[in-house]
Amino acid sequence: IDYTSELDTESDPLLIIEKSVELENVSFAYPDGRQVLKDVNLTLPLGELVAIVGPTGAGKTTLAYLLPGYIKPSAGRIRFDNIDLAHTGVNEIRKQVTYVFQEHMLLSESIRDNLLLANPQATGEQMLEACRLAGAMEFIEQFPDGIDSVIGKGGDTLSVGQKQRLSIARGLVRETPILVLDEPTAALDPKTENSLVEALRNTAQGRLVVVIAHRLSTIREADRIIFLEEGQVRDVGNHASLMAQPTSAYRKFVELQNG
């Protein structure tokens, strides 16, 4: 389900992204002047699982919203394979990026219909594979009608964790080069979380997978951690390398989380 975007809808076409996303001196401020992101410079290669980490209000979701073009930078440039998104139509951007929201936006139809909403051309095999990767087959197989089971208004026959897994499966079935997930493991038990993180690592072998994460068990598995604080990138690296730096902001954050 797409949000409206501030980006132009009629612009140059976008080539299929094959290499990386680049953010150059990117800042974002609300109309009232509140600065959320300040001079962000990042290169995010395809093939990596990237975790965006930081305290509440650090700008994590704002940074993630820039990738599918839900908002546009107040300053700076975002490029997909050196193509400036400022000159790219929002429909072309959305062909490259899937965003899975923390809120579960489900149709009161069947599981199959919910998956087809994301990718009307998806085959049965693709849908089942997406459900398997997201850990959703565990509960889908318990329903008499399987993937054709109707889940009720807003998915009210499902638990919060089941809704989350189905939302993730819907994101996976689009098979876009960039997949962004907001708190994908928040409502999952440790076993399901471990399985999903492993699936995301496998999914990232050909895609850029970006997760906004709070759980250390998810964060430490990322190939690259971006630690945000007060709208600025304080640290970039993997868990081991950042924890090895005595003065890193990420290390201090982790130590506070662990008490």
Residue spans for each PLM region:
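C-terminal boundary and immediately downstream tail of ABC-type ATPase nucleotide-binding domains
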Residues: 244-259
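Conserved beta-strand
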Residues: 23-26, 34-45, 50, 76, ...
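The feature captures the beta-strand-to-loop junction immediately N-terminal to the Walker
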Residues: 53-55
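Short beta-strand immediately N-terminal to the Walker A/P-loop
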Residues: 50-51, 99
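ABC-family ATPase nucleotide-binding domain "signature/switch" substructure
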Residues: 62-65, 94-103, 111-114, 128-134, ...
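Conserved ABC transporter NBD signature motif
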Residues: 76-83, 93
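ABC transporter TMD-NBD coupling linker
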Residues: 1-32, 72-79, 122-132, 208
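Helix-to-loop junction immediately C-terminal to a conserved catalytic motif
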Residues: 68
